[in-house]
Amino acid sequence: MNPLREDRASDRLVVLRSNRLEAAGFQHAFSTAIGPDREIFDLAAPGSSPMGTDPATNEAFLRRFAREFGGNRPITTVTQVHSAGVAVAPAAPGTEADAIIVEDSGPIAAVRTADCVPILIGCPRTGLAAAVHAGWRGLVADVPGATINALRDRGAETDDLIAAIGPAIGIDAFEVGDDVVAALDAAGLATCLRRGPGRSHADLFEATVSRLRSAGLKQDRIDGHPLCTASDERFFSHRGASGRTGRHLAGIVGIGGFDESNRSVH
């Protein structure tokens, strides 16, 4: 797996990108907490920022993030509920899901995180793309696998897919209780646990890799490396800030011009 690359814009906005997704033609970005002129780049939905960012400021930041993708593209999100639900853009406002698929180069599929795992997936052959939000509950429910199944239903082949895993809380910072340990054990993710004495810890990065591999992705089709939101000042951390923190966006745009005659049926 290749690590994500840090890109710094002329206004000093910092985002992370995947070399594999970029080489395949997918416009995408994982935001950080570092915005233009080093402002705190909170991409929470306007009016709902846990750190109290002014709604007008949130709106300006969202427009700035969208400019990373060129053109005048809307950012398409869902109401995230820690599930295995997958929506397809355009989704109705308030749609509850934890992944969103785009089928062309119009809207930006995006998810919000501040410790959970953001995953971006693209299929170069069909042009399909998806953004996925995966906390421990979503990994137990296998939202990565559900997203890959939904992409296959729309013509993607697993061997075509490229995935990039963004920053999330690391194993040293993610202390979990017995209920989480039991849930991960039952979901076949026991190898992603570091058990006590004392409290146990969970490795969300490795759990994500495990889910992607179980869904059929090869290791050399996955980009990313452990980047801990709780210990790296470039990122927001819900747990590290006791809830009063900003939100990242991870976004991706599909590739237009897909020929329907190339779409396979499953």
Give the positions of each predicted feature.
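Active-site microenvironment for binding and transforming phosphate-containing groups
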Residues: 1-266
